């Protein structure tokens, strides 16, 4: 069955959510890769101020996901999706006219918090509508997600030839259209409408006492830290191998990652599901993720086999990283729902995203420090060996998850959360 037929096989809310995510990522990524340059250039902010703005934007999203998830479970998925799109429209619109640091900070915080509102709600809504097709639904969702990431920067690059503020205005327009589209096309769906009324603190207590869920979040934090190296360690390695043509090599790595995500996602998911099943696929995917860094660990530079071979090792690592990331995402999203016991799904998604986001931030600081130390000592192998070790720990955590859940599966084989 082709991708188009699979897409048409989902109900209207699921299809709307997938298209919505495509639009969200186009609107976001047509702007964000170029924001720091605008802040430091035409707007004239100091480097510390640029870092502050980017940090506020990141924290207001990553740090607030659990708030968005909690609100979605209380007020329904659709209102939070619409509110998030509307707030991001306003945040980008403010960025068009912002000329001072306080106004830029407000705009950055608004755009970040908007993502914290709609992100858990979108995933909770899709999980509810997909029913038993969660893995397939999230695989298709990731195709739209990655397509937006690929196209967004290209659209932004074209608009930058005119003016950065036109790019920002266009991004605001995209989210404005998404707001209207969700109002018209997305049916109302109240999350956990039949559950007993509890306080927010009681809901949070349910989540933080869910040991299998926390084990998943901790293990996947390691996996996300490894996946993020397509933006950190691998580009830095490219600049070392090809200092005069590093951008060409980096573009090649991103092209490979994008092609795998968009063109291979459904095939990878189907093959993993048939070969290993939902639970074991997480372990296998994390194992491939850890193994992704073996090529660059064996050939960290051009001294042993030449620069060409080292470049091929780098591209191979990027390719394996892309395959592993594509393999993990659908099963990971299903696991969050399964471990929630279909209760407080958006709240679980929100906490999950916050835990992973904060963990990746800390992990990147550690990895960056390790890379600096390795460069001073001229021992690149330390970096790649450290990343492989992180992957091994993540695999061990996911295997431990099997131990947690082996005695608590319901009749459909989905993991059950503790009551």
From Swiss-Prot:
Fetch the Pfam families from UniProt: MFS_1
Task: Please give the start and end residues of each transmembrane region.
Answer: 15-35, 36-56, 77-99, 104-126, 140-160, 166-186, 213-233, 246-266, 282-302, 309-329, 351-371, 377-397
Which CDD domains does UniProt cross-reference here? MFS_MdtH_MDR_like
Give this protein's Gene Ontology molecular function annotations: transmembrane transporter activity
Q: Cellular location of this protein?
A: Cell membrane
Protein's membrane topology: Multi-pass membrane protein
The record's Gene Ontology cellular component field reads:
plasma membrane
Q: Which domain of life is it from?
A: Bacteria
Write down the Gene3D superfamilies for this protein, in alphabetical order. Answer: MFS general substrate transporter like domains
Q: Which UniProt keywords apply?
A: Cell membrane, Membrane, Transmembrane, Transmembrane helix, Transport
**PANTHER family documented for this protein:** BLR5212 PROTEIN, CONSERVED PROTEIN
Q: Which family does it belong to?
A: Belongs to the major facilitator superfamily.
Q: What protein is this chain from?
A: Putative uncharacterized MFS-type transporter MT0872
**Species assigned in the record:** Mycobacterium tuberculosis (strain CDC 1551 / Oshkosh)
- Taxonomic lineage: Bacteria, Bacillati, Actinomycetota, Actinomycetes, Mycobacteriales
């Amino acid at each position: 069955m082709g991708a188009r037929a699979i897409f048409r096989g989902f109900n209207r809310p699921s299809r709307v959510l997938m298209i919505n995510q495509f639009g969200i990522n186009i609107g976001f990524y047509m702007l964000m890769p170029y924001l720091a340059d605008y802040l430091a250039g035409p707007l004239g902010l100091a480097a510390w101020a640029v870092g502050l703005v980017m940090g506020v934007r990141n924290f207001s999203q990553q740090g607030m996901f659990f708030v968005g998830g909690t609100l979605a479970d209380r007020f329904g998925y659709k209102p939070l999706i619409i509110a998030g799109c509307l707030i991001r429209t306003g945040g980008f619109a403010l960025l068009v006219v912002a000329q001072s640091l306080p106004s830029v900070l407000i705009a950055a915080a608004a755009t970040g918090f908007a993502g914290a509102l709609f992100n858990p709600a979108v995933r909770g809504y899709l999980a509810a509508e997909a029913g038993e097709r969660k893995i397939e639904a999230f695989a298709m969702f990731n195709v739209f997600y990655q397509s937006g990431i690929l196209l967004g920067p290209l659209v932004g690059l074209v608009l930058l030839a005119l003016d950065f503020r036109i790019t920002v205005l266009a991004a605001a327009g995209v989210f404005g259209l998404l707001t209207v589209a969700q109002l018209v096309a997305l049916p109302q769906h109240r999350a956990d409408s039949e559950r007993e009324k509890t306080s927010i603190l009681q809901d949070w207590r349910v989540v933080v006492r869910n040991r299998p869920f926390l084990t998943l979040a901790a293990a996947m934090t390691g996996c996300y830290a490894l996946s993020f190296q397509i933006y950190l360690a691998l580009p830095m390695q490219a600049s070392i191998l090809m200092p005069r043509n590093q951008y060409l090599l980096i573009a090649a790595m991103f092209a490979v990652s994008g092609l795998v995500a968009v063109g291979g996602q459904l095939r990878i998911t189907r093959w993993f599901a048939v070969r290993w099943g939902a639970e074991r696929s997480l372990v296998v995917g994390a194992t491939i993720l850890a193994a992704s860094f073996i090529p660059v660990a064996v050939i960290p530079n051009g001294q042993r086999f030449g620069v060409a071979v080292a470049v091929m090792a780098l591209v191979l690592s990027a390719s394996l990283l892309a395959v592993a990331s594509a393999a993990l995402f659908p099963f990971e999203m299903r696991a969050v729902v399964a471990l929630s016991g279909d209760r407080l799904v958006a709240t679980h998604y929100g906490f999950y995203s916050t835990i992973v986001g904060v963990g990746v931030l800390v992990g990147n600081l550690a990895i960056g420090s390790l890379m600096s130390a390795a460069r001073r000592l001229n021992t690149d192998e330390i970096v790649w060996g450290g990343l492989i070790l992180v992957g091994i720990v993540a695999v061990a955590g996911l295997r431990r998850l099997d131990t947690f859940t082996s005695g608590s599966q319901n009749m459909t084989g989905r993991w059950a959360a503790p009551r």
